[in-house]
């Protein structure tokens, strides 16, 4: 059964783009035909992730000035050839784990990052926007028919905006992504009550995805008794004494206890099931290509979390 899954959030910074990319890549790795769409019209990022420039952008398709074949880029072979080269190097060095090739197909559709193109969509007249809504629906239909897509993964703009709402309208499954902060919680309530309720009534399924949850990363133990150590630039960095580490650990434990109840309470209040708790993996946040984690590090805990999320869907 074909599925269209949209990653959305009340505000930016919840990691939805990373989750969307890794979910799409993992599905393709499993042998599925996957189309990944950057429908974050206001702040697109996939062109940087994949270092690709298409013949035509999604913006062009929405304004009826491009066909879908000119928009979608097949990135399967480029990933696999890159991995074979990397595996060869690792094999010679006898270190690291080999990356896993994509056995399915992965296409990417990119939004134009240029200011004038974003402004053109944002300031379009009512008739143009009405036509664009039809094009959104047609986009989904073409990906299902022409590309035989098993899955369409959509990264949307955060918040309650015209283009983000219409991105959600083409999805069967809505993943409302949030972090464990008051701003995310309050904003998620607004989005769920004002937007998601309508989509659920029309047959869409919605779930809460808690991302960057505390519990994986722990404070690094001090490696020296010295109060200061030199960093790379030669300047000094003050080190926390060991009893400070204990205090931080105790504080984290207290925070965890205080936060134990509200995730389930929010789920109950909104009538939206929690589908995943994904810890904050500090090492991933500092990767230059965190969107490739499931491909490059198949045994990483984050990869298992994405596996669980996909299985739950």
Predicted regions and their residues:
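Conserved GTP-binding G-domain of TRAFAC-class P-loop NTPases and closely related GTPase folds
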Residues: 259-260, 275, 280-312
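Conserved catalytic-core segment of NTP-binding enzymes
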Residues: 29, 134-275
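P-loop/Walker-type NTP enzyme "switch/lid" segment
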Residues: 41-144, 285-292
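Short, hinge-like loop/turn segments at secondary-structure boundaries
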Residues: 52-56, 194-195, 224-227, 293-295
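Walker A/P-loop phosphate-binding motif and the immediately C-terminal alpha-helix
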Residues: 2-42
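Short amphipathic alpha-helical segment that frequently serves as the phosphate-/nucleotide-binding helix
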Residues: 17-22, 185, 189, 303
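Short, ordered loop/turn segments at secondary-structure junctions
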Residues: 39-42, 113, 158, 179-180, ...
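Hydrophobic/aromatic beta-strand patches that form the interior of the parallel beta-sheet core
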Residues: 5, 37, 107-109, 173-175, ...
